[in-house]
From Swiss-Prot:
Regions of compositional bias (Basic and acidic residues) in chain numbering: 329-338, 617-640, 738-750
Biological source species: Homo sapiens
Cell compartment(s), UniProt: Cytoplasm, Cytoskeleton
Extent of Low complexity compositional bias: 193-210, 220-232, 244-258, 363-392, 701-720
Descriptive protein name: Smoothelin
Keywords per UniProt: Acetylation, Coiled coil, Cytoplasm, Cytoskeleton, Phosphoprotein
Organism lineage string: Eukaryota, Metazoa, Chordata, Craniata, Vertebrata
List of residues that carry Phosphoserine: S299, S301, S304, S341, S357, S503, S514, S523, S576, S729, S792
Amino acid sequence: MADEALAGLDEGALRKLLEVTADLAERRRIRSAIRELQRQELEREEEALASKRFRAERQDNKENWLHSQQREAEQRAALARLAGQLESMNDVEELTALLRSAGEYEERKLIRAAIRRVRAQEIEAATLAGRLYSGRPNSGSREDSKGLAAHRLEQCEVPEREEQEQQAEVSKPTPTPEGTSQDVTTVTLLLRAPPGSTSSSPASPSSSPTPASPEPPLEPAEAQCLTAEVPGSPEPPPSPPKTTSPEPQESPTLPSTEGQVVNKLLSGPKETPAAQSPTRGPSDTKRADVAGPRPCQRSLSVLSPRQPAQNRESTPLASGPSSFQRAGSVRDRVHKFTSDSPMAARLQDGTPQAALSPLTPARLLGPSLTSTTPASSSSGSSSRGPSDTSSRFSKEQRGVAQPLAQLRSCPQEEGPRGRGLAARPLENRAGGPVARSEEPGAPLPVAVGTAEPGGSMKTTFTIEIKDGRGQASTGRVLLPTGNQRAELTLGLRAPPTLLSTSSGGKSTITRVNSPGTLARLGSVTHVTSFSHAPPSSRGGCSIKMEAEPAEPLAAAVEAANGAEQTRVNKAPEGRSPLSAEELMTIEDEGVLDKMLDQSTDFEERKLIRAALRELRQRKRDQRDKERERRLQEARGRPGEGRGNTATETTTRHSQRAADGSAVSTVTKTERLVHSNDGTRTARTTTVESSFVRRSENGSGSTMMQTKTFSSSSSSKKMGSIFDREDQASPRAGSLAALEKRQAEKKKELMKAQSLPKTSASQARKAMIEKLEKEGAAGSPGGPRAAVQRSTSFGVPNANSIKQMLLDWCRAKTRGYEHVDIQNFSSSWSDGMAFCALVHNFFPEAFDYGQLSPQNRRQNFEVAFSSAEMLVDCVPLVEVDDMMIMGKKPDPKCVFTYVQSLYNHLRRHELRLRGKNV
């Protein structure tokens, strides 16, 4: 029945009942009921969280269920009306504003769906407009497109036939079956040429060719290459010059399937770039262009399938003074696509432009898609499907005065695995020096930059690694300066050993390990190579680039290296281990305490603690011997101390054997001591027995035994340690007083042990206070008989004294705001506890309500100055020191000052009591 009554109560009522209940069995039942209530509450919360789209009001509205049903019906009707309104809305900005103002999840879901629908319609319209604007016939058959592609690829062949054949063998595709997990690497280079570039420009944008390997036919809808002629030419030329014509080379439009795509377009020297808007579905890649006045749009796309693992070979790449060997890396693929293809793009604008040179081929690790498209600075939009990647670039750089290169990360979603890889655009400043390819003597594959002050250039790299394994991604940025080579690792696992090569000068690498770090480089003028380590080595996709000196980082690197070396050198240096013999020679506990605080080694701390125990034991033994000596001296002194009346009775009983061979003597001495005020009585009984036996030859043996019994009684009131007053008159340190105190200690200790815990602590505190008072009292004429502390009588250690002081401070500051005294460190950090302590004794000294925990300095100054002025308590800790120590001041400093404050305030309190009496 009692359990049922408890089950009907809430947790607050049960806790109040627990506070007033003393029966252990009843308290156990109440605690069980509280635990059951908490368990039920947790279960309800777990069920609510497990339910989809949890709403708290639906759970709490159980009493008005009908109204809740009506409200849900109204919400459904409102959603239906909203869906009808959204069908007629085609403005993305209006829908976005509506989305921001919507508060319900279902409404926001409908608005997001409408925004996706409108964007899809815009993309379709832009794609159609781009097709119509390009003037390219869309009704051409697959065979016509195939022939056109072959014809244009044949026009762009380079003289190096050996490298062409070798590259064609390397890049020969291997079909990958659908439905299997494969790695897809996407490298997108967006180059925007200045509109008014002339023949005086040192370099102009040129895109890299692709390998002329046999390609299977692909669907035209999946790979479109839209181009426009230079202003003034309505139609693109059917057969442009091979390598020296200033007119742009047209790119073939190949049919597209799930296999490979080769679309080659080169940007002309006088073309205005157009924006590119890629849209990728879950299993294919679609390219669509945003409608608008775009004179030129060209792209380069290569998609090759993954080769079997056993066919992958490691071919070293010649890179400056050292060789960079990484089999099947993105670096190898880009070298193959840009430098080793049968087509070489050479643009001439008054002066010969940079040409592409072959490099040593390397086998591909997996399928890769490389796209090079001039990007417009005015607009760029992208739309993502369930697993697509989008990048929007609408920022342009103006002239040489623009900021340094910025690395930005854009979120993207990939595949069913859901692994996101950040696509980081790189904005470069125009006018930088021309960098060289990694092969000595080779012309640069991509050269960008202008010499005009008003010119602008934008290069964007989008690197996408699609992996079926769904591995976690990490990033690392390596930023050198000067002639050094910067290496940027995007979103992949770092290799165990990262190799870096430089074309000349010193090589200094600063490693920044945070993946999301924004790094600023110098004016990057040339992308030298790409590098991707195979999955077996968990390598990263690296972009290497030449950079102008932006700021001297070498000093910082050297400083960091020096600091590291300093730490390494300092590590072996340590203090010699302490020995037990050295510690035994230390006689000061304070020194050992400091050593214990400063030591961090476990063995040293163990030795120091052992030495502390030994030292304390020696001091205890010394105190015991001193006490025995004083007892003997007190026994030899005649008379009793002043203020006491003593009565002594001695009884002696002797017994002799009949033959006289043995004598037994018993002496009993009773001493009764009364204090003059009649509050204390001490009784001491001493029994001495001796047994003497004589042998026949005259020798004898004596055995003596002494027993002492002491008892005392006191009618003095026992109270709290803080309510007792000091003794005004000193007392005599006689033998009777010592014996009486010893008996009182034993009696009060037994009483404290028999009481409950709260009463035991109070009795122990009262006993300690009384012992300290009695120990301080003594005869002025003779030596003061101080009571020595001993663990046998329960005398507290330092921790208990600190706890007693904390209890006193809590009692005096109870009820003050912003005061919660739990320790001698953080509880005193804002100064409010000091102010409350002083204000409790001197309410008229200052207005406590005007103080604030935020104004720490004022609190310390008010408390310290008031205590010094009112009770002459010198501030043992400075205000500046407390401010410097912050939220966790030194406990020893705080304890020392609080102890001094306690002594002065207690004296003031006792003086007030004496005046009132």
